Amino acid sequence: PAADAAGSLQKVEVTGSRIEQTDTQSDAITNVQTQGVDEGGIVKKLGDYLIVLRRGRIFSIEAGKSALRPVSSINAYGPGISPGGAWYDEMLISGRTIVVIGYSYARGGTEIGLFHIDEAGKLHYRSTYHMRSNDYFSSRNYASRLIGKQLIFYSPMEVNLYGDSSNSLPAVRAWQQKPGAFKRILPATEIYQTGLSTDGYDLTLHSVTTCDISERSTLDCRAKAVLGPGSRVFYVSADA
């Protein structure tokens, strides 16, 4: 089966700088700007395993011995989901939960995939969530962060002043073969304004969404947002 095709991984090349860690830091943290705040990346470490996100697939590789050994591989998207028009380019790990963040141009939103890695390094699919969002891509930054068991990510929404404004508000739904209704995650009391002058053609709702990660297949999310011009810089600290 495709999910067990670990043998198809013939060669893995990883480049980057070495990051010194203390015994108190999470083993999964391999890419940070701020201590204690993990960033989305394509290579993570969990115990003796390297977890690699590459070309729409997740690979687990045993690295605790004298040689690398492919263990398991799985699609970075759920069963029945077409990867066409989608980019899966960010991965984080909380406990034994692997989170893959992607953007689908075909479905028009952010995809959040939840996977599980067991003690033997085998990968299992759990669930996928679809969040309303415009493209968050930045050549200088990742969109997601992880602090403990809280997933935090940024997503912009262009505000349509001449149509249904509810479609401009952040909302989440669980992926199913027959898509269900979106659940709004941004209350009106959590929308703020910058005070900067802007016109209706450059009005963006910059939302920061926080989701609680657990060993279950569910994802509980809530959002805050700032209304202002399209330009932005995204930064997350451990205590603010």
Question: What annotation goes with each model-predicted range?
Answer:
Residues 1-240:
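Beta-sheet-rich non-transmembrane sensory/scaffold domains
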